Amino acid sequence: MKKHKKYICNNCDKTGHDSKSCPDPVTSWGIILVKFDNLGHLNIAHDKNTKLTNITEVKLEDALDINKASILIDRIQFLLISRKHSLGFIEFMMGRYSLMNMDHLSFLIRQMLPTEIKNIRDNINNFDKLWSGLWGKHHARYNNEYHNSKKLFEKINDVRSVDITLEFLLDNIVPSPIYKNPEYGFPKGRKNKGERGKECAIREFQEESGFDIEDIKIIEEVEPIIENLTGTNGIRYRHIYYLAELVSDKEIPLIKTEHQIYEIGSVNFYTFNDTQHHIRPYHIEKKNIVTKLFFYYMEKLMNLGKT
């Protein structure tokens, strides 16, 4: 009797389908790391099953609280990483556009950095150089996308295939890029086969930030934080983050691994205001998460030492 293969989805962990046909949002796992700058090692107590959805404000009862809050406001810092390449550039290089929809292609180009647009112009007839510059030695894992994207790239540069070539689009139609700086976010990524969510979050955090698991304390009492969004490609995404605190005196590691060199632009801690500035305006839910975490820790620090 022929046995039917039992599928276990690596995206949602449910049975009956694989990740390519999963109806759930494309899910990534990561860690939001909080640092208390110049406050020493704090022993902050957390209530079990804490949900950030219940946090909406910081209560300031008197002038002493206001003064304390003004001191603490820049002491709570969040670890952000910037990607080496913009999402617009990656989507373009992966061939996630249609020659029948120039408006969407123009939108992707506007999301790119000026340096990326210049790179395309300089290599308008050399897709392979653009591809290897994007993925380095990891290009083999994207072989399927490579062949499809290269065909699209060659077509959009061929006047016999399209009315508007990529070169003409770059030089005459697409307005200036919207952003001059890369996109910032938290360390995260998708699970490897057979990997659990928390394992994935820790691995991605270590690979992207350079910190080790011994440098941080994952706050188990706070429930994982969920960010839902829809990409410019119409695909639904879900980012699930564990909250963690920095417990070592380790400086921010230098970007030196092969993974970091090709994927990460920078790693740094930022104050609440700077974090809000670096996160792009359309990431409203991410900004709200940072705000709730800031309120949460302000309340915790304000109450330290109070009876």
Range-by-range predicted roles:
Residues W29-K35:
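Short beta-strand scaffold segments in enzyme catalytic cores
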Residues P23-T27, L72, G234-R236:
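A short catalytic or substrate-binding loop motif that flags glycine-/basic-rich loops and adjacent residues
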Residues L39-I71, L108-I109, K150-N172:
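Intrinsically disordered, low-complexity domain-flanking/linker segments in eukaryotic proteins
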Residues L87-L99, D103-Q111, E116, I120-N123, ...:
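Unchanged
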Residues R83-H85:
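Short beta->alpha transition motifs characteristic of CBS
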Residues M1-T27:
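A short, cysteine/histidine-rich metal-binding "knuckle" motif
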